[in-house]
């Protein structure tokens, strides 16, 4: 299956109950040859309405951090969520919803083959790095797993709720830029 076939299959997914309440599947966006992949927990209301990840106020903030380190959604990264459909009232996804969506994310990994994965927020980091990951204590640190570097950082929505954490998040993006320069071949071409 190539990337476009994967996108088409994902947009018609009915593997869990979230398909009944969604407006759009939020497959992800960006460069399918990106060496850097950003992954959040799941789409919110704005994302569900537009079918794109990280839009609205938190998406604008994320774009500011990305641009500060020369990363752009349409050029040199790919951005997605673990769960591709919005849970009602933005609740945490249920275990069966995680399980239903995980094959989509695995296929995205397989096709994109990122060198670095940035987990946006505690829940994504706990799912992808390790269950006891503390985003407030371990943000900005890199962990190598099977040849891929993982980093957890504060979720942009959390930064909007607690602006005092913005400098910490910005330092994570500076560390990300340094890691990209160390391990990536074409992100900054």
Pin down the residues of each PLM region:
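A polyanion-binding, active-site-adjacent surface
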Residues: 1-189
